[in-house]
C-alpha cells in the first residue's frame, strides 16, 4: 500500500510522468521477455473438437512479487504480439512499482499463433478466428498461469490492458470474465462504433477535424483532391501517375479510386498516430505528424510547388519511395475495414474480423469531411465479405454479444480516449458509472497513454496516466478484501 | 406501479399465495400457447458456418400490455419445452398481474429443436450442443422479439426464469447478457456444484437427510440395502430377481449394480420432487412422496412383510410394473449424470451435457449416506465420456466460463433453494450481495416455487414467491429509469 501512495505522491507532485524508462520510441529500453507457448483448444465451444494449436505468449517476471504483485495482462490484438510489447511502455513504466507479473498473450490467427500455419486463412480454416474464441484463450491461459505461478485472487489480481481493438478486448474480458479479470484499462477502444452504433461518416470527419487544427491545411487538402478529381474527369491518368510518381501507372477509374484510397489512408494514419515524438508504430513518422504534414503542404504551395506535387510530398511523409516511386498497390490494399488495410497474414485476419464481429464501415462524403466521395456502407460491406470470405455478415451479433451501449452493469473499466484520435467519438467519453470511468486526453492520439513516458508527453497524457493508476490501485485494493482463493 | 403495490398488499396481507389458477398439477388450467419457430445459426461462434436450424418457442401474449408489460422469459432446459410450460405455473400466476409477454424458447437438441433430426446425437453432430450456443440462441431470439413486438428496455424489461439447469441458464444469462436480461429468478440452480466445486458425496447425503426426517426410515433402508448386499455376496441373484419382480432376471455383479442404481434412483426422484401435492413432473408421485414412501416401508415391515419385498414396494411408488414386473433397464439407464438418467433423445443430450459443461459427479459411500458404495469420480466420468461421446472432459472450463464461486460482480439474480431439495447445497444459500439474493424455502423440494400456487403449498413457499415478486418489481422499476431504447 505504502508503495502505491509513494507512487501517487510522485505523480501528483511533479506530474512529470514516470521516468523509469525513457526513449521508448526506439525500443532501446524495452524490457526483455520470455517467449512461451501454450496449447489451446481450437474450438472452446465445441467439445467434440479436440484439436489444439500453439498460442504464443510473452512473459516478464523480473519484478514480480508473488506475495502481493498483480498480473498485468495485455489483451493481444490484431498483430504480432512483439510489436505490442514494443509499443505499450506504460505497462513497463509501472510494472516495477507494482511488482507485477507481465503477460502478453498473442491473439489467435496473428503473428506466430496460427492454428493452421500459412493455410490458416483458407475459407475452411478461418472460422475459428473469433472474438469469443480469443477471449476464451485468454481466460484459459490466465487460469493456467495462476496455477503455474501459484497466484490467488487476493494477492495477485489480474489487470487487463489493451489499446484499440486490444482495448475492446480488455473491456470485453471484464464484461464476460470478471471472475478472472479484476479491472481493465481500455485505451482508445471504440466499443460503440465497432458494435455498429456510430454513423459511417464519423471517423473521417474526425480525421478532418484533426487537420483542421492546423491553419490553412484543410482548404489545401480539398484543393488537392479537387485537382485530382479534375484530372481524373478529363481522363488524364497520366498526369496523376506522374505527379504521384506511381511505380505502376494508373489508367482507369479503378486505379484512380485506389490512388484516392492510398492518399486518404496517409491522412488516416497520421491522425491516428499524431504523437508528440517520432514513432514507428504504424509507419515511421516524425513528431506531431499532422502538424508536420500540414506545415509542409502550406510551405510547399507557398514556395510555388504545384498542388499535386505538394500532395505527393505529403504522402511521402508516411510512404516509402525507396524505388524512387510509390507502389500504391503494395502500400494500400482494399479491404473490409477502410481504415486499416495492409499486406500479409495479419491483414488477412483483420479483414476477416472486419467482416464478422467488428463493424468498421467508414466512408467519406466531401461535406462533413475533406475527402472525395468514397462510399462504403453495410450493403457494400456485405458484398465484399461474401465475396472475399464467404461469410454473410451477422449485423446484429456484435451488439447482442458485446452489449452495445448497454454496459452499465459492467464495473472496473477505464475507457481512455485522446481527442486527437479519430476513433475517440466511437467510445464512451463520459463516466458511465462510478466504476466505468472515462479518461479524456486532450492532446492524445490513438492510445498515447499506453505508450511509455516520454519527455515530450503533453500534460494531458500525464494526468490521464495518473488517473489510470489511481483506478488500478483501487481495483487492487478491492481484491485485497477477498480471501486468498484460486480463480 | 399501483398494480404492483396492490399485488404486494394482497400477498403480504393474506400470504395465501396467488390463486388465479388452481389445480396446476393436472395442467387443467395451464394457459394456452402459440407454437412458433425461429431460424437460429447452428454455430453462433463460427461465422463461416451458415447452417441454421429451427428452434421452437412458445408464446402467450393474451395479457401483454406493450406500454409497460415486461417479458417473462423461461430459459428452456433439458427437455421438451411443453413439459416446462406445464410445470412452471408461477409465471402464469403472476403474468396477468404484470401484463407480461410470456416466452418459452426450447433448448437446442431437446424436444423438437433438433438441428439434425434424429441423427442430432451422432458424434459428428452433437458438438453444437453447448451452454454457450444455447445462451446465444436465447439472446438472439429475445432481440428478434423486441423488434417483432416493438419492445423497449424501459417499458418491457426482460425477466428470466428457470428451474434446475434452467435456473442455471437464467443466472448465466444475467452474467453474460445483462444487456438483454434485466433480472433472473434462478430456482434450485446448483451453480457451484455443476461447476465442479462441490464434494461428490454431497447430493446423496442430502437425499439421505430428507429420508432421515421420517422416523425409522433410514435404518430400514440401510437394512434393505444390506439384505441386497448379502444376497449378492452369496451369488443369490435369483432371490433378488424374484423379490424385485424383475422382468429380466439379473445374473451377475453388473446386473446387481444396475438394480442398485435403479433402486437408488427411486430415492433420488422422490427427494427431488417431494412436493406437498400429487404431481407428475419426474414420474407420477403422491403428495409428499418421501413421507409416503417411508411410512409404507415402516408399515410393510411392521406387518411382517420381508425387507426386500417392502423395498420393492417402495420402488413401485415411482416405477410402473404394468407388465407385472419391473424393467430396470428401461426405467434406469446408466449415464454420465447418476442423478438423472433416462430413455430417449432428451436423455442422450443431457448425457452429452453432463460430459461437457455440467459437472455432475455424485457418488455414494454408505457412511455419509444410506446407500451402498457406488463410486463415481472424475476419472470414471472421463472414461465414460470418452467412450460414449468421444469427448475429453475439459474439467476446468465450466468454472472459467461460468465464474465458479466468483459471481459477486453479477446483479439482479434471485437464487432460490428448497431445503428438501437434495441439490440445495450446490448453490448460494445466503445473499452474495444486495442484488444477488438467496431465498430459502424450508419445506420446498426442487424448484417448488416455480410451480403454480396450490392450496397445499406450505407457508415457506408462499413467502418465497412474495420475496421473488418483490425483486422482480425492483428490477422492473430499475428499468423504468432508463430511456426507451432498443436492446
List PLM regions with ranges.
Chain A
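Catalytic-loop region of hydrolases
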Residues: 2-101, 112, 121, 420, ...
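Glycine-rich "HGGG/HGxG" loop immediately N-terminal to the catalytic nucleophile
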Residues: 109-124, 449
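Alpha/beta-hydrolase active-site loop
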Residues: 125-149
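Alpha/beta-hydrolase fold nucleophile elbow
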Residues: 151-165
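Alpha/beta-hydrolase
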Residues: 163, 169-351
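Small-residue-rich helix-loop
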Residues: 322, 329-398
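Short beta-strand/loop motif that positions the catalytic acidic residue
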Residues: 409, 415-417
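Conserved alpha/beta-hydrolase "acid-adjacent" motif
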Residues: 417-418, 422-427
